[in-house]
Amino acid sequence: RRQRQMCIRDRFTVKAELPENQRGTSASYFDLRVSPNQAQTLNVVIQNRQADPVTVLIKVNPAFTNDNGVVEYGEQVGRTDASLKVNLKTLLKAPTEVTIPALSQQTVPLQLKLPAQAFAGTVLGGLQFMAKPDEKATTSGAVANRYVYALGVVLTESDQVVPPNLRVQEVKAVSDHGHNAIQANIQNFEPAMLKDLTVEGKIFEADGSKTLYQTRKHELKMAPNSNFNFKVDLNDEPLKPGKYRFEGVAKAGGRTWHFKKTFMVAQKEADDLNAAAVKKAPAQANAIDWRLMILAGLVVLLTINVIAFKRYARHHRGA
């Protein structure tokens, strides 16, 4: 068996004890070739590197895609996609917490049980290890240092490639940290990882052809069977009620997806979002007006030329 080690700062370390069905030789996470109805014990070794006992909380989570287009393995309530049929959280069981004595290590067994029915594509998730907060620190109101690490788990049953596939779901107006935006939820509804994704979105009036707003993002990733909220910024302009159209183009791996969806912004919705939005900074009263600067320069040059001409004329009259 091979071992790979990841250090969570210097408080404790986690090692994945890679089994014989590990795919590849360089991965530091579990990347396993499995089969239907398979049962297997996976081991991780947690080493406490400090002089006091440490309690480590362990969670199993399915992978999800955050709204920045980054794949994460932490716990996120409400982010599990409706298209996810095989969830790592139901396949892999781990103790909720373990306490490691000072300056020692402990092997923690995890129980993996595959469903009887074969699955296609990739099951992706992770193990989250977090130092349990100090109760004294939390009750006193002090900010507790929390050491967190996510160890990836990848499961496949064959080399058959399942291509990713995208579609747009709900489109609506939202507040993005105090800034008005149009949010289009984009879903990857296949059990396939998506990398180097570029998405461009444009907003039009429902029957219009003029682009009102647009946003382009690149180098995004998506977990299998996940979704994320792609936001088109309104440049701090007030949101107007009415019927609009979202058009998007996504590109990855030589494939292209086109999206189109109409949506409504109600009067009250626009009023509420505008009231809560960060107001666009007004132009400064003393901002430079370049036209006035140019005009002033021409006046100065004209004045200099007039004075020079008068001196020249006086000089020649007196000669």
Q: Whereabouts are the PLM-identified features?
A:
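Short, small-residue-biased leader/transition segments that mark boundaries at the very start
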Residues: 3-8
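Beta-sheet-dominated interaction scaffolds and their linkers
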Residues: 16-50, 54, 97-98, 165-177
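Short, solvent-exposed loop/turn segments enriched in Ser/Thr/Gly
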Residues: 26, 37-43, 106-108, 120-126, ...
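Intrinsically disordered, low-complexity Pro/Gly/Ser/Thr-rich segments with frequent PxxP/GP/PP motifs
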Residues: 78-118, 204-239
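C-terminal membrane-anchoring or membrane-association module
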Residues: 292-319
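Terminal connector regions
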Residues: 52-79, 107, 113-160, 237-276
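Membrane-proximal extracellular "stem/stalk" segments
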Residues: 156-292
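Short solvent-exposed strand-capping/beta-turn motif centered on an Asx-Ser/Thr pair
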Residues: 47-52, 63, 117, 187-193
